[in-house]
């Protein structure tokens, strides 16, 4: 999560308790590093930045992925878990990445890039990791604009 830091005048990441990721909370450092490496490699081989932005780099055609893990749409009360029928944020994100054409969310549809289940798991881990970086308030007002789903 993020909370407002009055001194810095923007929201900063708050690292919470250990939580399960794809049903596990016992990843070794080596396993976690391999998963992150797979996700970064998948983001490069699938050319995610041809459409998306990450840390200010890339294109502006599709949503900014810098804090995708924290996007309210993926939270338990958000629309994407219900839309995908998955019970956790990471499962919903992985399902969407593997079958984007089944879940129309914006006026611009994400193409099916042939992302495998393992690549999707790595991509979700990579996006979760990226969301934990203190970006000094960038992107501004992230997650506060309501009604961005379904092209509204």
Indicate where each model-derived feature is located.
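Post-cleavage N-terminal segment of exported redox proteins
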Residues: 1-33, 126-152
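Extracytoplasmic electron-transfer domains, predominantly the class I c-type cytochrome c fold
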Residues: 30-37, 42-45, 55-136, 151
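Short cysteine clusters
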Residues: 48-51
């Amino acid at each position: 999560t993020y909370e407002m830091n009055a001194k810095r005048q923007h929201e900063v990441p708050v690292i919470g308790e250990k939580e399960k990721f794809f049903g596990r909370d016992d990843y070794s450092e080596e396993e976690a590093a391999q998963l992150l490496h797979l996700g970064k490699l998948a983001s490069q081989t699938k050319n995610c930045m041809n459409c998306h932005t990450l840390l200010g780099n890339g294109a502006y055609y599709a949503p900014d992925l810098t804090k995708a893990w924290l996007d309210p749409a993926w939270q338990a009360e958000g629309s994407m878990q219900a839309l995908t029928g998955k019970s956790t944020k990471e499962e919903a994100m992985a399902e969407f990445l593997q079958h984007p054409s089944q879940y129309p969310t914006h006026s611009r549809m994400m193409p099916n890039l042939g992302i495998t289940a393992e690549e999707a798991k790595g991509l979700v881990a990579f996006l979760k990791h990226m969301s934990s970086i203190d970006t000094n308030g960038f992107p501004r007002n992230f997650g506060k604009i309501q009604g961005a789903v379904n092209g509204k």
